[in-house]
Regions:
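"Short basic amphipathic alpha-helical interaction patches in structured regions
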Residues: 71-75, 93, 97, 122-125
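Short amphipathic alpha-helical segments
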Residues: 78-86, 132-136
Length: 198
């Protein structure tokens, strides 16, 4: 992915990422409209400015940690939720007529909510920012190098074996994660004392 033109900016109302698009940019106008009108939760919405035929996209940075700094230990439940969120724009983007090749896979610009473990991505609807399938697969594989699953390390080994098999299909990977999620029994909810005092 093209990393040219990314700039962090601070303002009184928060932090922003600005991306100045090339002068002769070819935008995906359908994607621009979709994101402005009904942006999916896994993407950051953006504003656009056009000054002297130079278009700049401006994304407000959420109160979350950059994937670049996200590492450590996860329970299997947390990891499966986290990884399912990373896959979401690549397997569900077409539901919004979005091409997953334009989802930014640079870890600095992917934001993970510390509470929900869900990720938000930048979508850059311009041809020069298009990822190859190999770049997307490398991104998803490299995330595994930053984490450890404390209660099922064999599952990480299974994922590594899948990637090293060489025939990675995003929908198959998503199905693998969903299958593991269905095997994990939900934690019981603590019930309070429901007896009423007389």
């Amino acid at each position: 992915m093209n990393e040219h033109g990314f700039q962090m900016q601070s303002a009184l109302d928060g932090n922003y990422i600005s991306i100045a698009l090339p002068a002769s940019c070819r935008q995906d106008k359908i994607a621009v409209r979709v994101i402005k009108e009904s942006c999916p939760e896994f993407l950051l919405s953006f504003g656009m400015t056009d000054i002297n035929d130079r278009i700049t996209l401006k994304y407000k940075v959420p109160n979350a940690v950059s994937l670049k700094y996200m590492n450590g230990s996860f329970t299997k439940q947390m990891f499966v939720d986290f990884y399912e969120g990373l896959l979401e724009p690549f397997v569900r983007g077409y539901d919004w007529f979005l091409d997953y090749h334009y989802v930014c896979v640079i870890p600095d610009y992917i934001f993970v909510d510390k509470q929900t473990i869900r990720s938000q991505f930048l979508y850059i609807p311009e041809q020069s920012y298009r990822n190859t399938d190999e770049e997307i697969i490398d991104f998803l594989k490299n995330v595994l190098n930053k984490v450890m699953v404390t209660d099922d390390s064999a599952f990480l080994v299974q994922l590594y074996q899948y990637f090293n098999g060489g025939n990675v299909v995003l929908s198959d990977l998503d199905n693998m994660i969903k299958a593991e999620k269905s095997k994990i029994s939900p934690k019981p909810v603590m019930q309070g004392n429901t007896a009423s005092a007389v």
